[in-house]
Swiss-Prot record:
Gene field: Tmem106c
Membrane topology category: Multi-pass membrane protein; Lipid-anchor
InterPro entries on file: TMEM106, TMEM106_C, TMEM106_N
Lineage of the species this protein comes from: Eukaryota, Metazoa, Chordata, Craniata, Vertebrata
Keyword field contains Lipoprotein: yes
Subunit structure: Interacts with TMEM106B.
Membrane spanning stretches: 85-105, 196-216
Descriptive protein name: Transmembrane protein 106C
Keyword Endoplasmic reticulum: yes
């Protein structure tokens, strides 16, 4: 505002059948208001605002009838340090976005074969079967800043291209952020039938170490932040079928499929 002239104009809807005397009276009132001077309320020589009568606000019944005019040079329309505040807000938004992107960006989840062992061996003489309880261990390394879930695990044991055992599990484990976790599971494999000679080989007392080679294919499904990935491992293992609780060493480990 300032030492300037202002007007509070009354806008009324005029119809063609309005009384000419009323229109003339309204025009005279508008001209009288337009010539009414005022200065800032905070000024030293200020006078009472004609529209609000010093109350600091316009009465509700006159909100839609009065218009306040503010000079473009009024300092209240130009807040101090506006550019600094806007720049600081932009920088803070960029920093927050960068941190969120860094911590939520998917990092690698590695799945490795940590070896197997035969925890139990039993023989079915009637059917010439060798039953192996093969306990396998997977090492899962989570490099993310949030936990990941092992939602599904499937493993299959083969001997001479014949499937002799399988294992399936859901909701296996939850891997904490930035950590390694071992997942153990046991597959029951029955070797016999067309391979009945394995029974006679594994029960032959003249042989001290009864080694056979089995092939394992393991698929692990991992889920995190609405994303699901799968890793598949294939490996050949040398196992002793002649005694229980025998630790074995892998002959060949061939990872297959995408590592997360």
């Amino acid at each position: 505002m300032g030492s300037q002239h202002s007007s509070a104009l009354t806008f009324c809807q005029r119809k063609k059948d309005d009384n000419p005397e009323d229109l003339l009276a309204e025009r005279d009132q508008e001209e009288a208001i337009a010539q009414f001077p005022y200065v800032e309320f905070t000024g030293r020589n200020s006078i009472t605002c004609h529209t609000c009568q010093g109350a600091g606000y316009i009465p509700e019944e006159q909100v839609n009838k009065l218009v306040a005019l503010i000079p473009h040079s009024d300092q209240r329309l130009r807040p101090q340090r506006t550019k600094q505040y806007v720049l600081l807000s932009v920088l803070l938004c960029l920093l927050a976005s960068g941190l969120v992107f860094f911590f939520l960006f998917p990092h690698s989840v590695l799945v490795d074969d940590n070896g197997i062992r035969v925890s139990n061996v039993t023989f079915n003489k009637q059917d010439s079967l060798v039953v192996l309880d093969v306990t396998a261990t997977l090492k899962i390394r989570n490099s993310n800043f949030y936990p990941v879930a092992v939602t599904n695990l499937f493993s299959q044991v083969q001997y001479m291209k014949a499937v002799v055992g399988s294992y399936t599990a859901a909701n296996v484990s939850l891997i904490p952020p930035r950590s390694e976790h071992l997942v153990n599971f046991t597959v029951k494999a029955e070797v016999g039938g067309p391979s009945s000679y394995v029974y006679f080989y594994c029960t032959l007392p003249a042989i001290l170490v009864h080694n056979i080679v089995i092939f394992m294919r393991t698929s692990v499904q991992i889920s995190y932040i609405g994303h699901t990935s799968q890793s598949t491992l294939e490996a050949q293992h040398n196992v002793d079928c002649g005694e229980n609780s025998t630790a074995v060493q892998s002959l060949l480990l061939v990872p297959w499929g995408p590592h997360l």
